[in-house]
């Protein structure tokens, strides 16, 4: 009996060992090509599975004991060996490096310098023992699953491309199958001119002397020799510079006849502002002349020297969006060249674009009243037209009359001032104008700056001042004139931003007038004027942060309901059972008496 059990145990072990051997199956997965060099013999699991884009880290790779493997496989073509007689960096197939193990010297091997390898992997639990003739590894992925992988040496990436045979019979078929878009054999049809230039469009020029439309040229180097090509057009809004040489066999004859050496050939034309100007060449509003930014003299042959030849051309082009080109200027740098056979000249061509700006007198930068929020005590900034200044109040002289000098309104500071005005005019309209100018100052403020660093060019940083002049219809007197005698400037402001660093800004402002009627055409009158400024803080304080809610344990009113119900039900049951017992005893007693 023991012998039979021993035989059965040996049979099971043999069956398990046979099934554990690596067999080709549908569960094996081939991984794409990766670059490797030589095998590593230690059998240690790795922490990363083989990837299709990266080479598996050579941690666990076993080799047969008697196998002979070339650790530096020779390739028929070494694509990275670009320097003869010199070792190219990271080129593992370069024979000039004379390295047996290139990876020990290089940080990596360039693609194409080593043979590709593919991996076939199965679950590691299926493997009992491996006797594969190929290098093997055990990988562990991030989820902890281990895989047993075998590297094969016949990767498809090492196969050669199929060479196409081209002859007169299949030439057209191959060109149609693999060919793409090419240059059109016929020039495209002429399209109607667009309304405005787009970035990269060639710039149109017009020569009035010959009535010819051409393009603004920017010669550039072309070909292996880098000679100047005149046909290169300048692109709209593409600021760039080009450099190219010119060679002259006979400079003596070319000195005065070659257009490329004459500065006049670079400005004796007009530039079209927009492409649609080509439809009306007689309309000068679509054309911009090329102006000279520097003096340029014509070429001159003096003895053995060619003088005043162009060595640099600089175009400055100002554009204004869809309105096109507004101004074109050109400047030159000229030099002299000695006449000799095969002489050369290096020329530079620069085209620079910039935005068109109306020329204005530069105004000094006004000081800020804060950055960005207003600072208390700094002037309140106002705007009239495009001019920024500070708001002012009346100022009186020693005799009480209104002075030409005025007090500046300081942000956050309430103030009041007054003076006596002796009008020079007696006409009502002129009198009203004089009084208004005295109250407001000149010029009259129209907008107030929201922040202390407001820019006059940015209208979004200013808010209009609300005002309403005195109503003439409110006076019934025909010979009376209604004039303002008091001006109250109300400024609403608030803090913005963090409470630790608040920024004051103006939310709005208005002028409030108190009016008075005076007799028209009355000479020698004096009018008492008053101005006051009032700053109102409308800052809304945020709600203070609340504490964490405190725990207030309260039991519901029916928390003990189940227990009460059970107790009440138990009492009723006890009461019913007592009644039942009494009934049984009573029946027993009656039965005993009847017997």
From Swiss-Prot:
Glycans are attached at residues 167, 336. GO terms for cellular component: membrane; nucleus. Residues 23-62 are annotated as: Disordered. Residues 23-575 are extracellular. InterPro entries: Tectonic (IPR040354), Tectonic_dom (IPR011677). Keywords: Apoptosis, Cilium biogenesis/degradation, Glycoprotein, Membrane, Signal, Transmembrane, Transmembrane helix. Residues 1-22 form the signal peptide. It is a single-pass type I membrane protein. Residues 595 are cytoplasmic. Part of the tectonic-like complex which is required for tissue-specific ciliogenesis and may regulate ciliary membrane composition. May be involved in apoptosis regulation. Necessary for signal transduction through the sonic hedgehog (Shh) signaling pathway. Part of the tectonic-like complex (also named B9 complex). This is Tectonic-3. It comes from Mus musculus. The lineage of its organism: Eukaryota, Metazoa, Chordata, Craniata, Vertebrata.
């Amino acid at each position: 009996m023991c012998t039979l059990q021993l035989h059965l145990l040996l049979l099971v072990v043999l069956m398990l060992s046979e099934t554990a051997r690596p067999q080709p199956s549908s569960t094996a997965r081939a991984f794409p090509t990766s670059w490797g060099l030589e095998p590593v013999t230690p059998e240690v699991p790795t922490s990363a599975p083989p990837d299709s884009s990266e080479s598996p880290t050579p941690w666990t790779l076993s080799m047969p004991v008697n196998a002979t493997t070339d650790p530096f496989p020779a390739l028929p073509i070494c694509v990275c060996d670009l320097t003869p007689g010199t070792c190219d960096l990271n080129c593992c197939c370069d024979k000039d490096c004379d390295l047996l193990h290139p990876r020990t010297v290089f940080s990596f091997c360039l693609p194409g310098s080593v043979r590709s390898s593919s991996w076939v992997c199965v679950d590691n639990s299926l493997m009992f023992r491996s006797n594969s003739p190929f290098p093997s590894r055990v990988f562990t992925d991030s989820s902890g699953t281990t895989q047993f992988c075998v590297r094969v040496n016949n990767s498809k990436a090492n196969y050669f491309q199929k060479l196409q045979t081209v002859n007169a019979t299949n030439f057209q078929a191959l060109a149609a199958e693999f060919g793409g878009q090419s240059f059109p054999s016929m020039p495209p049809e002429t399209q109607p001119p667009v309304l405005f230039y787009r970035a990269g469009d060639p710039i149109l020029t017009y020569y009035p002397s010959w009535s010819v439309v051409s393009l603004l040229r920017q010669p550039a180097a072309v070909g292996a020799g880098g000679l100047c090509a005149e046909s290169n057009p300048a692109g709209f809004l593409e600021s760039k510079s080009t450099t190219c040489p010119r060679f002259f066999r006979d400079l003596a004859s070319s000195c005065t006849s070659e257009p490329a050496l004459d500065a006049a050939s670079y400005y004796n034309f007009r530039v079209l502002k927009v492409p649609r100007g080509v439809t009306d060449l007689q309309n000068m509003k679509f054309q911009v002349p090329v102006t000279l930014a520097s003096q340029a003299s014509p070429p001159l042959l003096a003895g053995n020297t060619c003088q005043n030849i162009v060595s640099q051309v600089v175009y400055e082009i100002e554009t204004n969006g869809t309105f096109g080109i507004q101004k074109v200027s050109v400047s030159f740098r000229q030099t002299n060249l000695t006449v000799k056979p095969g002489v050369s000249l290096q020329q530079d061509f620069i085209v620079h674009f910039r935005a068109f700006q109306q020329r204005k007198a530069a105004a000094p930068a006004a000081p800020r009243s804060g950055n960005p929020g207003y600072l208390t005590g700094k002037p309140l900034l106002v705007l009239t037209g495009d001019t920024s200044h500070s708001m002012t109040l009346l100022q009186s002289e020693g005799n009480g009359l209104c002075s030409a000098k005025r007090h500046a309104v300081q942000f956050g500071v309430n103030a009041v001032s007054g003076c006596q005005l002796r009008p020079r005019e007696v006409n009502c309209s002129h009198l009203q104008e004089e009084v208004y100018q005295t109250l407001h100052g000149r010029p009259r403020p129209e907008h107030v700056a929201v922040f202390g660093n407001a820019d006059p060019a940015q209208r979004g940083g200013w808010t209009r001042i609300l005002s309403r002049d005195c109503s003439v219809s409110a006076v019934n007197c025909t010979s009376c004139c209604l004039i303002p005698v008091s001006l109250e400037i109300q400024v609403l402001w608030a803090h913005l931003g963090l409470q630790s660093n608040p920024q004051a800004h103006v939310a709005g402002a208005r002028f409030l007038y108190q009016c008075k009627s005076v007799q028209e055409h009355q000479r020698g009158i004096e009018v008492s004027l008053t101005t006051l400024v009032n700053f109102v803080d409308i800052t809304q304080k945020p709600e203070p942060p609340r504490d964490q809610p405190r725990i207030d344990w309260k039991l519901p009113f029916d928390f003990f309901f189940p227990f009460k119900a059970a107790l009440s039900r138990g009492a009723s049951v006890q009461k019913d059972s007592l009644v039942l017992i009494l009934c049984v005893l009573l029946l027993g007693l009656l039965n005993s008496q009847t017997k």
